[in-house]
Amino acid sequence: MHPGNVWGGSLDAVDSDRIAAEEEERLRNTTEWDRGAIHSQRSELDETQQGWLLAPQDNWRKKKKKYVNLGCVSVSRTVFLWTVGSIAVLFLVVALPIIIVKSLPRHKSAPPPPDNYTLALHKALQFFDAQKSGKLPKKNKVSWRGDSGTKDGLPDVVGGLVGGYYDGGSNVKFHFPMAFSMTMLSWSLIEYSHKYKAIDEYDHMRDVLKWGTDYLLLTFNNSATRLDHIYTQVGGGLRDSESPDDIYCWQKPEDMSYDRPVLSSTSAADLGAEVSAALAAASIVFTDKPDYAKKLKKGAETLYPFFRSKSRRKRYSDGQPTAQAFYNSTSMFDEFMWAGAWLYYATGNKTYIQFATTPSVPQTAKAFANRPELMVPSWNNKLPGAMLLMTRYRLFLNPGFPYENMLNRYHNATGITMCAYLKQYNVFNRTSGGLMQLNLGKPRPLEYVAHASFLASLFADYLNSTGVPGWYCGPTFVENHVLKDFAQSQIDYILGDNPLKMSYVVGFGKKFPRRVHHRGATIPNDKKRRSCREGLKYRDTKNPNPNNITGAMVGGPNKFDEFHDLRNNYNASEPTLSGNAGLVAALVSLTSSGGQQIDKNTMFNSVPPLYSPTPPPPKAWKP
């Protein structure tokens, strides 16, 4: 029996065969659909695979990117390899050649050829070696010179007066121009030591200077506390002399056998001041030799009360005919200004700058008279040099009160002097060849031109060093290069840029004086001794000198640019110590070797600070 139909509906029997058939049909349809799907997927897969095989080679396989772990960051392996490769290439292209070049032996590039001023300077310094008196050092390179004057001053002068320099073509030692020459050489060394070093003349120059200052220390009792005299010259003579002396005889220094008198003076304020200036200036040069510098300073200061004393205010040449005939001094107050400035720079003692700026000193010297003859620097006129030297103080340190008023006047006077040197103001005549006639057409023009060229060139360097582009000549502003051009034009004339195309410096250029008025250069170096008058035949011959006195600057041409190369014409053909000192100073100021600047500081090494130093802070307070 069957139970009742709880769900409702018919309780009739189901056709089992029909149900089975329907189920079979459903399963068959499902199976066919699955096979189609599978077949479709397989067809698509086959097409993709074919695409892989048929695609270009660089696209047919895509690899997964790889990375390199650098610790702090991960980068693509490709980027990493590119970076490393680039660094390697950069090393090969840049670093490796540098390493190779640095590992090779170094060859310094050749320096530029020296200019004419340098070449002439080498020559000009040799003149001083040819003028040395006394027992010569072994390294003296002038083959035709030997020991001479080894008994000068003996036995009358304690220690003698051996050494120093002969002045020109004679065998006289004039202390006044010799001291001035040493002062000028020191000045050029202080301002341009780097240039002397650049051309390898620094040690030579100092040897030349020391030979002179060693001798000047013998010309007075430098160990005394109070001086009563100073020696003014050794040897001498007059042009009309008829007894054996340095003028009457024509002998080389090594053969001298006549008496050589020593002249002295108890009232030679000008000479005392000049020697003081020379020693003070040299002490600045030799600061690296403290003992010698101290000795020079002591000598310079010992002379100060001597030349300041009113009882000694006479010129050294007064009453001395053999001095008056050649180096007659005409003033002394210009030397006072000159010495005062150098003493101050050497010692820092304000007493000296106060003296140099005392109004009565420049007024007595006529420093502000604006007279052309007082604008010409020389062994006899220190005004232009002294005022430029103190203008330096104002330009670089500007000390102010109480010196400013007088320093300003010195500065203005220096500017006026420089204006007077310029052609457009027609203060001094010029030859048709361009040589300025500072000595008003008188003989020996080159010495004055050389000193003026140095001062002009130096003043331009002072202004350039302070950043001042020029100065005023009245209402007209003049640039510094105009002064340099002036100095160059005058020195170029001396070196051969003149109507005769002739160098007036022996040994420089192809054409130069061959018959220089000079005893030592005139007589053959054959070890034969000539008597007092025997040498006259060498003076009077028309043949060139057997010995070239290399570097000697002769007196020069006349106002018509004419020069006669004759020994007897001593005004034209004789060199002098002070002339060559001016030439050396001008040449070193103009040469481009070592640069164009000056040494601003060495001059002031001993000058004290202008203002009181800041006091130290108080000690820390403690209860």
UniProtKB/Swiss-Prot annotation:
Keywords of the record, alphabetical order, are:
Carbohydrate metabolism, Cell wall biogenesis/degradation, Cellulose degradation, Glycoprotein, Glycosidase, Hydrolase, Membrane, Polysaccharide degradation, Signal-anchor, Transmembrane, Transmembrane helix
Q: Please give the Gene3D superfamilies that the UniProt record associates with this protein.
A: 1.50.10.10
Per UniProt, what is the membrane topology?
Single-pass type II membrane protein
| Principal cellular location given in the protein's record | membrane
UniProt EC number? 3.2.1.4
Alphabetical list of InterPro entries matching this protein: 6-hairpin_glycosidase_sf, 6hp_glycosidase-like_sf, Glyco_hydro_9, Glyco_hydro_9_Asp/Glu_AS, Glyco_hydro_9_His_AS
Q: Which residues form the active site?
A: 517, 565, 574
Secretion signal span:
none
Is Cell inner membrane tagged as a keyword? no
Does the keyword Cell division belong to this entry?
A: no
Q: Which residues are glycosylated?
A: 116, 221, 328, 349, 412, 429, 464, 548, 571
Cytoplasmic face residues: 1-79
Name a GO CC annotation attached to this entry.
membrane
Q: Which GO terms describe its molecular function?
A: cellulase activity
Q: Which reaction does it catalyse?
A: Endohydrolysis of (1->4)-beta-D-glucosidic linkages in cellulose, lichenin and cereal beta-D-glucans
Q: Name one GO biological process term.
A: cellulose catabolic process
Q: In which tissues is it expressed?
A: Expressed in basal region of leaf blade and proximal parts of leaf and floral organ.
| Spans within the Extracellular topological domain | 101-623
Q: Which compartments does it reside in?
A: Membrane
- Give the residue spans that cross the bilayer: 80-100
A Pfam family annotated for this chain is Glyco_hydro_9
Which family does the record assign? Belongs to the glycosyl hydrolase 9 (cellulase E) family.
- Protein name per the record: Endoglucanase 7
Originating organism: Arabidopsis thaliana
Q: State which gene encodes it.
A: KOR2
